[in-house]
Amino acid sequence: MLKQTLLYTGKAKSVYETDSADHLILVFRDDASAFNGEKIEQLDRKGKVNNRFNAFIMEKLAEAGIETHFEKLLTPNEVLVKKLNMIPVECVIRNYAAGSLCRRLGVEEGKQLTPPTFELFFKDDALGDPMVNESQAIALGWATADQLEKMKELTYQVNDVLKALFDAGNMILVDFKLEFGVFHDRIVLGDEFSPDGCRLWDKDTKKKLDKDRFRQGLGGVVEAYEEVAARLGINLDDI
C-alpha cells in the first residue's frame, strides 16, 4: 500500500491517502496536546507506543465482534485503516466521575457512576468540542437516529470489553471517548484507543496512567503509557 497525499494533520496523528480508495494511512506522531491545543509538547516514543497500543485494543475489540477501521500495522508509527466517512460526534462513556463532568456538575472525582453515563460531544476545536444531545445531532445533519443508536450500542459494548481487560491489569477504566464513521453503509469504530483518549487509574493507589499526567503536569507521561502496555502484555521491545 503506497502512502500518497497528506489529507489532514490532527493534534497527534497525520492522515494520508493511499493507492486504495478504501484505505488510509495514519501516522502517530510524538505530539502531546491538551486544552484544545493550548498546551503542546513533543514526547519521545509516544507515537510508537500509542500506535502499538491502539493496534492491540482494536484487535481485542474485533475479537469481541466489534468492527473497527484497523487493518494492520505498517511501521512502528504507521497503521493502515479503512477509509471511513467520519461522523463529527464523539461518544463518551464515564464509569467514574472525572474531568469535565466534575467541573460541570460539582461531582467529586472518583465517584462511581451506576449505570455508566453516555454523552455526545460535537467535534469542533474552535468551539471547544461542546456537549450536544441526540436531537441536536440529528437536526443538524451530523448523524441519523439509527446511526446514533448504533454508536451508543457499540460504545457500551466497548466499555464491557475494555473494563474487563483493564481490570485484569489491576486498572480502572474511568472514562473514554470513541469516534465512529460509515464504511459501505456500516457504522465502524474509527480514530484510536490509547491513553490519550481515556482515563486509567491504578486500582489500589489511584495513580493516573493516562493523558491527565500531561494535562496536570505530573510528568512521566510516556512511562505511564508503557506501564499500562506492560500490564496488558503488549510487547514494545521492538519499537
Swiss-Prot record:
Protein's name according to its UniProt entry: Phosphoribosylaminoimidazole-succinocarboxamide synthase
Keywords for this protein: ATP-binding, Ligase, Nucleotide-binding, Purine biosynthesis
Entry EC no(s): 6.3.2.6
Segments crossing the lipid bilayer: none
GO molecular function: ATP binding; phosphoribosylaminoimidazolesuccinocarboxamide synthase activity
Source organism per UniProt: Acinetobacter baylyi (strain ATCC 33305 / BD413 / ADP1)
SUPFAM superfamilies assigned to the protein according to its UniProt record, in alphabetical order: SAICAR synthase-like
Cellular component aspect of the GO annotation: cytosol
One Pfam match: SAICAR_synt
Domain of life, source organism: Bacteria
Catalytic activity: 5-amino-1-(5-phospho-D-ribosyl)imidazole-4-carboxylate + L-aspartate + ATP = (2S)-2-[5-amino-1-(5-phospho-beta-D-ribosyl)imidazole-4-carboxamido]succinate + ADP + phosphate + 2 H(+)
Keyword Magnesium: no
Disulfide bonds: none
GO BP terms in the entry: 'de novo' IMP biosynthetic process; cobalamin biosynthetic process
Annotated NCBIfam families: purC
Family: Belongs to the SAICAR synthetase family.
Broadest EC class assigned to this enzyme: ligase
Pathway: Purine metabolism; IMP biosynthesis via de novo pathway; 5-amino-1-(5-phospho-D-ribosyl)imidazole-4-carboxamide from 5-amino-1-(5-phospho-D-ribosyl)imidazole-4-carboxylate: step 1/2
